[in-house]
């Protein structure tokens, strides 16, 4: 094995990819704006399509769109040729990913998509490709080189396609006035959803309450607190009115 400077190589990869991403920002213009307008007018879903690495990007893009207010689904280009293209309806928008723009399976799908009169937005690395020529809107995410020294491994081209996809999703989010509460609705079991959607009544305990008389000794509060494992006891008076609470934090401070 050759002795190489691993840190230098890693930094070089990041630098190349960063420059590629920055160059894509300069390409964003009318095509991007038209793509946003078409999607905002769409009454169906944004159906993302891709194969290989572009398929992974398309799947990620669909997930991001769906979670930020734009209904979307992903269709694998290979599976699309064997029935899955039936999931594309004429009120949808096709968002197609291909770095070369010449992916055979993608090109085979185009006549079927056109029969549905579906708008085709392509995110491609070659704006002169067959896919680009067959698209209604072309978003160019071509890069001068990959971060791979062989200029073969999809690296910079992947980063730029993801960057464009994220830019599209967030632009649509802002256009729709999508809020954190809307985001929480599509993430009900995540930390954001729990924080924004759950009410105190959903999580508070209402049965087998750790109740003591406020005149009880401190040792009694420890016993009750340990028994119910809530980290707190509720103190009541002779008329069963709540007069206060005593927490495990209060206990630690008392015993210092």
Where are these regions (language model features)?
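An N-terminal, well-structured beta->alpha segment
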Residues: 2-41
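Short loop/turn microsegments at loop-to-beta-strand junctions
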Residues: 9, 122, 230-233
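Terminal peptide-recognition signature
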Residues: 17, 50, 95, 168, ...
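Short acidic active-site motifs
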Residues: 31-35, 80-84, 220-221
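Glycine-rich phosphate-binding loops that contact phosphosugars or nucleotide phosphates
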Residues: 40, 44-163, 167-172
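Internal, active-site/partner-interface "lid" segment
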Residues: 133, 147, 174-205
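A short, polar/charged loop-to-alpha-helix boundary motif
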Residues: 147-148, 250-256
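Bateman/CBS regulatory modules and CBS-like beta-alpha motifs in cytosolic regions of diverse proteins
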Residues: 194-224, 230, 235-237, 242-243, ...
